[in-house]
């Protein structure tokens, strides 16, 4: 009905109707924008912006190896969506769980292509990656490390869902990215998707709206509220107040990048957001990360960026979900923040302190967030988190009970 209203009054070309945030994507001639804005039911018009990619020592820095040794957790049973340029399903580190092609245990259990095949929504599209960025991220989260096993992901026995929203050049429209995000929510029960990694971002393009009003940020928050722990890269702009859409969304876990010496990487974007919200939430190693090199079959390559930090943190979430499948996305965020090693926010390794240095421990700052992710404490706290519920009601009476006594429960 909304589409009919638009097409009958202006020359509107429909792309997609979103259900999670009550929005429609499409195109309209510039000269019809004012007319469009006056149609009944039109609350806001946004420019369809462009999102782009934002470019094993991490396991040692964050204590992931200790998890394998002390608990045996390896991500088994957890599923993470990689919302990116795609995933190379032919790479030996991503083709199956046990690296034995004679067994039926795929690593990638579903794939949706919002760029070139959006009509195929059942998840059965053959996985591919015509850029390479998404495969590198997928390997960081859950690659097995085959054939040499020198560079496995954080959760090597977790499974993946590929959601291609960026093209072969590494960019995509807000509308296309949102289509992939909504598909992920709609299929979360079908494929048991509990976490998602989005190593992409852009800046607020509409001066008269805050980032929270941008549809892609609202969609990100809806993903979290629908049970998916969403990790988003802070960006690589290297300066403060430059965390843009969708990393500026309130409910997501925004990830900054560390060098291997655990200092903030020189490129890692810093908060606050446009609204003054402190971001990022946490920091993870993102420099010189070795992971899958797409379309090589067996190769690995080094990349740096908050793009590389984000899937690493998502891999830790997969370990936490294995330890306790009852966790909510907010449990994941809170535990990761509370167990992080606090870092004072000296900018880019400079000697001068920044204003937040005097704040108490575990208060989030705009450089490191709550600090460096500590995987083992996070997983142990996740495992020990117990939800207690009781239907019992204790009623204390100050008056002796007689045959005529009554208890009123209001």
Feature annotation, model-predicted:
Residues 138-141, 161-167, 196, 242, ...:
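Hydrolase catalytic cores
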Residues 106-117, 244-322, 326, 377:
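Extracellular S/T/G-rich loop segment that most often corresponds to the catalytic His/Ser-adjacent loop
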Residues 28-29, 47-50, 81-86, 112, ...:
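Active-site-proximal beta-strand/loop segments in catalytic clefts of secreted hydrolases
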Residues 3-76, 95-98:
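Autoinhibitory propeptides
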Residues 68-112, 118-175, 189-195, 225, ...:
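Subtilisin-like serine protease catalytic core
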Residues 3, 74-76, 144-148, 165-251, ...:
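Substrate-binding/access-modulating region of protease and related hydrolase catalytic domains
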